[in-house]
């Protein structure tokens, strides 16, 4: 008799707590259903544009460095060396383009980064070894001409981060 | 080219590609894993993550390319072929 009235309010409070929990659950469900994913998608699209712009900057810088190197080589060395350097530089830009494309597809249409870009140096070395008009060392140095543009891009990014 | 030089060149070419691809392979795998996790957590930072991944992949894969070039030179333009 004495215990029952003491327990009764506790039961009432637990029921109230349960009702509050139910109402909270309903409200959270309603917020989930009304969740607006628009800003996240817009930010993701803007971020993809940023990646495309980064690619374009790197390609422009690589082409500029390649043109400068080919011009200097043509001035100081034979035309055969300059042509080999030009072919190597174009192969390097193609390699970088394929790498950028496979990284762009990572997580969306493929689960891993493809290795198709490694065909480019293989074909370059094979072509240089088979064709007597081309030389191996200038072609390989030309292939590596995309690296200065990458280093320049990293330096630019680190400087902009430090300033911001 | 005598047979010993040919055999040594072939073995060296295999070792150059095989050993040279181990480190970059592991590094690229872990980098890609981190990038995909980062994109899944922060889709708004996708461009920056992909840009950083592109730069790091270009530098990592160059190690594989060095091994590949050494192997191809040994196989097709061997300087030790008398």
From Swiss-Prot, chain B:
Coiled-coil blocks: none
Entry protein name: ATP synthase subunit c
UniProt keyword annotations, A-Z: ATP synthesis, CF(0), Hydrogen ion transport, Ion transport, Lipid-binding, Membrane, Thylakoid, Transmembrane, Transmembrane helix, Transport
Spans traversing the lipid bilayer: 7-27, 57-77
Pfam families to which the protein is assigned, alphabetical: ATP-synt_C
A single GO molecular function term of this UniProt record: lipid binding
SUPFAM superfamilies (alphabetical): F1F0 ATP synthase subunit C
Subunit-structure text: F-type ATPases have 2 components, F(1) - the catalytic core - and F(0) - the membrane proton channel. F(1) has five subunits: alpha(3), beta(3), gamma(1), delta(1), epsilon(1). F(0) has four main subunits: a(1), b(1), b'(1) and c(10-14). The alpha and beta chains form an alternating ring which encloses part of the gamma chain. F(1) is attached to F(0) by a central stalk formed by the gamma and epsilon chains, while a peripheral stalk is formed by the delta, b and b' chains.
General function of this protein: F(1)F(0) ATP synthase produces ATP from ADP in the presence of a proton or sodium gradient. F-type ATPases consist of two structural domains, F(1) containing the extramembraneous catalytic core and F(0) containing the membrane proton channel, linked together by a central stalk and a peripheral stalk. During catalysis, ATP synthesis in the catalytic domain of F(1) is coupled via a rotary mechanism of the central stalk subunits to proton translocation. Key component of the F(0) channel; it plays a direct role in translocation across the membrane. A homomeric c-ring of between 10-14 subunits forms the central stalk rotor element with the F(1) delta and epsilon subunits.
Topology in the lipid bilayer: Multi-pass membrane protein
